[in-house]
Amino acid sequence: MFGNWKFEGLEIAEAHCDGPCGVYDPAQARVEAESVLQLTKKILDLKKPADGDDKARLAYKNTLIRFVAIKEERAELAKHHLLVLWTDYFKPTHLENYPDLHDLFWKSAKLCSAVKQEISLEHAQELMDNIKRIHEIFWETKGKDVPWYTAS
């Protein structure tokens, strides 16, 4: 594809991420984590049908499996979006003003794993709380006042 191109004499371009788009927003992680929280609530609210009602038990199992699968997928996406922010957007200079930044992201990534492994309303809410703090820090670094909100 690049066989006929000449790269001699060109300067090396350096970017802060894999693709230098510069488009970052913790809202992506929030949406995914909010889905995890809502699915956790739905799973906890599911009522197991009475014994002997095979059709209802099958529907219950199907719904439970679907909710768990989607919850795990959304937790992995939240983790991905958090890691992109952590490794591509935030720089060493941000640590001067936010010395707990690495710990916040590390704990958030661990919470993404925890909410995949278990059905914990506490951990799902803790993940949302951490992402809210990341949201606040992120927008402070951009000098913008962007209010936190949730879709549900």
Regions found by a protein language model. Give the residues of each.
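Short, well-ordered coil↔helix boundary/capping segments
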Residues: 72, 95-102
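Short, charged low-complexity intrinsically disordered segments located at boundaries
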Residues: 73-83, 137-145
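Short, solvent-exposed, charged loop/turn and helix-capping segments
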Residues: 81-98
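N-terminal intrinsically disordered, cationic/polar leader segments
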Residues: 1-65, 99-128, 133, 137-152
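Short, mixed-charge, low-aromatic patches
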Residues: 61-68, 86-88
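Alpha-helical segments in soluble extracytoplasmic regions
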Residues: 53, 64-81
